Amino acid sequence: MAQECWNKINIPFPSAVSSTRIPFTGSIDLLIDCLLADCEKVLTLLCSEVLQTEIRVLYELLYILNNGFRQHKPFRALKQVEQCVNRLKEMKLQAAVEDLKEVCPNKFQREAGAEAGECDVPSQPMLEWLGLKLLGASSLLARTLERCTKTFLLTRQHLRLGEFIVLNVVITSMLSRLWVFFRGILRALIPMYRRNCELLQKVSQSQPMAYLTDFTLPEDLKDFLCLTYPDLKIEEVTKDLLKGTRGKRKSKFSLLSKLFGDTEQQEEIGEGERDLMPILSAGHYEVSSLDLGAAVSQRRTDYSDVSPYGLGIKAMLQQSSKTTKQKSLEQQMKLDSSSKASLCQKRTSLKKTSSFRNMAALLKELMNWCRSCKFYQEHKRLAFLSLKCGRMESLEAEGVRVEKRLKTFKIKVQKALTLQQTFPPKHSCSLPALLRTRWQNKFFMRHFRTLRRRSAVSRKSSGTVKGSLNQRRKCRPLLQSSNEVESGENVTASVEIEKMDSQTSLQEPNIPKDDIDDIFESFGF
């Protein structure tokens, strides 16, 4: 088989018997009893109604947010959590644990086997196949825990910004419950795997039937997971640990406190809580002499400023708001100074580049830096220039001389790095931006005025031409009916026609005075 035969959703079941008869002793009896108890723990966690409800909530959230939050980073991380949950269902861990529970002898069978000296137990192929299943399920659960923490961190960022508060609160609560359940299943699988390996050794000594030939199962599941997930810290729940934690309070911080604050803030909060505990718990152990049925009038000072325990709430809140504002301003100043220094370094390295091959590597570094600093415009411009750089790199490899192109390309990269300085935002009130907008408005107004003048002139010329043609059409019938009208009237009409023709000739000198027939004769028709 392959080296990572456990890293499969469907591991083929061995075509061999599921149980064998071996000599039965007290150690095997105790081992099978512990293995059945571990199986019961895993099954109760997997079949929990709370877990199934949280998974259904996850599916419903993804169904609702599919259209509006497709480019949302927490939504993408939630999709990865859903993929892990679906793979955990598809690998059928619950069915495998139930099969092992059925194959293992129950209490009465173990008692009969102890009397007879022999008993039926799971065979070596069955135990090896179950070991592969447990390895795959544990690695998948560790991956699910990692995805849950990443999604939790992303939603925490949006909560700090005050975006989608109700949605992010629902997501964080759901993820925290899923994280607790999957961590509990993983902690229950570790002792189960160890006892499975111990039983496998004893069965292989008496009835050897090797199913895995090219792969050996690791002895400890915790060491196997720490190789791929070094940050994963898993502690087994034992009776001694539970007894020790009953009387003592845990000094470690929970996952929420680790995710929501720095270590220095946690230490300060812890010291403050230790100082406040005697004040807050002072009245709990004193016996009150007040009658519960009688009205009590307690005199207190200003409710808004001082609490009943003597703490200045308003002063505390003002101090916390001031400290948070100061920290945010300091962080912004540090980021600005660091980005300017790194930008100067990038420019110096850009000047030193001597080939497009080095330029391509430098562009990748610049794109990663812009992405980390959230310079999205520069990142887009550099991504476009990287495509050009790839083409120039291929030409350079063919032997084409590209020294001049490299110089112009360096200038383009420098312009792309200073994109935010050259193009300020739309709502900026800087003097260069205002001058630029005024110049653009003046240019557009001039262009619009010239267009209006041209359109007015063209309308006037077209109107005069139409008027002259209409006047000619009206005057021609008068000339044709000159025989029917008196001579005096004909003379006056002809004089008027000559005046009108002279006026039209003055208005439009370019219009020809020939008839339509003369025009066609000039063309040769």
From Swiss-Prot:
Keywords: Developmental protein, Nucleus
Coarse class of the protein's main subcellular location: nucleus
One GO cellular component term noted in the UniProt record for this chain: nucleus
GO biological processes: negative regulation of neuron differentiation; positive regulation of Notch signaling pathway
Keyword Disulfide bond: no
Nuclear localization signal: annotated span: 435-453
Cell compartments where the protein resides: Nucleus; Nucleus, Nucleolus
Nucleus found in the keyword field: yes
Family matches, as Pfam families: NEPRO_N
Protein's job: May play a role in the Notch signaling pathway.
Protein family (similarity comment): Belongs to the nepro family.
Listed name of the protein: Nucleolus and neural progenitor protein
Gene source species: Danio rerio
Taxonomic lineage of the native organism: Eukaryota, Metazoa, Chordata, Craniata, Vertebrata
